[in-house]
């Protein structure tokens, strides 16, 4: 099965405010607004790839970010996500990047975050209140 970022096709700046999610066959995993998803990718690129988008995690950052992930690349994406999750644990929540294209942009909630958020690996929570990385893993597992 193919994993898709639903509702955006090819991800563009002008549609970041649309609701998005991961779609695998008939399964839909709600994420939230496109600008939230862009923040996840921006945070990874800025903190883990020295701002060089896709240089360390090309399957997730390039292929999936463009809208689809081929079934043949799901295992690679899972391995990349494991590394991302592990490495984000070393960064405090204040290292979040809302928009790598404009580093002055801040999350709508500012610094007002839950005490449960201890690092960037558990910073991102979907619009359904679920841990983003857990939902991402679930979608990738379903896509196998």
Q: Model-found features: residue ranges?
A:
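Acidic (Asp/Glu-rich) sequence patches and key acidic residues
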Residues: 2-138, 142
């Amino acid at each position: 099965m193919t994993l898709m970022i639903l509702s955006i096709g090819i991800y563009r700046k002008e549609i970041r405010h649309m609701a998005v999610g991961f779609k695998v066959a008939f399964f839909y995993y709600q994420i939230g607004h496109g600008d939230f998803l862009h923040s996840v990718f921006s945070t990874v690129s800025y903190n883990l790839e020295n701002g060089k988008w896709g240089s360390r995690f090309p399957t997730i950052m390039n292929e999936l970010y463009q809208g689809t992930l081929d079934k043949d690349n799901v295992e690679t994406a899972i391995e990349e996500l494991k590394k991302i999750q592990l490495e984000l644990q070393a960064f405090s929540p204040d290292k979040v990047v809302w928009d790598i294209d404009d580093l002055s942009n801040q999350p709508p909630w500012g610094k007002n975050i839950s005490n449960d958020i201890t690092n960037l690996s558990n910073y991102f929570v979907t619009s359904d209140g679920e841990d983003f990385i857990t939902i991402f893993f679930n979608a990738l597992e379903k896509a196998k």
